């Protein structure tokens, strides 16, 4: 929990005591993040091009909102009344973590996640099934036969994909950030190769 600064700001000529704000509750912080991310999403592009790979998109804003809401719904922050949670108070004794469990937080988090998935931009990266092989790209090692999945194409099964290569390609640099459909937001690299 942090203090939420009002939108109108402060007169910085005031004393520290006058500028001091108490911390807001965890739930108030999550509500603020959710509201701001929805507002940001309205002004962000749906997709990014190669020159703006490190810039946030609508999906990045909505995913940030969804993640904050998932944390708020989790047992750590939702109805936690252990010794640590009881110590999380302001100077006036106000509890910063709500000790009352609220099941509706899970519904709100699920709806926020569905907003991201509903954009239709992000999906699991898959490499095609390969019957030929080379040193760099071995033939697909087929998983053991399973009557429900072996004879169906992805996403219902694995007949047309290479599960190992689908995973490996994301980590060996073969799939660039621009070509990775799983990537919601990235730091990327600048022209000199240094991390941004």
What role is predicted for each listed range?
Residues 1-195:
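Structured, solvent-exposed acidic/aromatic patches
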């Amino acid at each position: 929990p942090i203090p939420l600064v009002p939108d109108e700001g402060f007169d910085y000529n005031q004393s520290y005591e006058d500028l001091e704000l108490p911390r807001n509750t965890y739930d108030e912080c999550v509500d603020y993040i959710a509201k701001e991310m929805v507002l940001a999403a309205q002004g962000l592009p749906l997709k990014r091009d190669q020159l703006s790979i490190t810039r946030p998109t609508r999906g990045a804003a909505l995913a940030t909102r969804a993640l904050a809401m998932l944390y708020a719904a989790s047992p750590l922050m939702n109805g936690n009344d252990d010794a640590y949670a009881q110590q999380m108070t302001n100077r006036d004794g106000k509890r910063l973590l709500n000790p009352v469990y609220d099941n509706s937080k899970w519904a709100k988090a699920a709806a926020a996640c569905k907003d991201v998935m509903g954009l239709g931009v992000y999906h699991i990266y898959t490499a095609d099934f390969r019957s030929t092989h080379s040193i760099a790209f071995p033939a697909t090692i087929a998983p053991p036969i399973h009557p429900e999945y072996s004879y169906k194409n992805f996403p219902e099964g694995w007949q047309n994909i290479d599960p190992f290569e689908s995973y490996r390609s994301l980590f060996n640099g073969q799939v660039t950030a621009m070509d990775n459909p799983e990537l919601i937001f990235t730091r990327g690299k600048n022209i000199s190769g240094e991390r941004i």
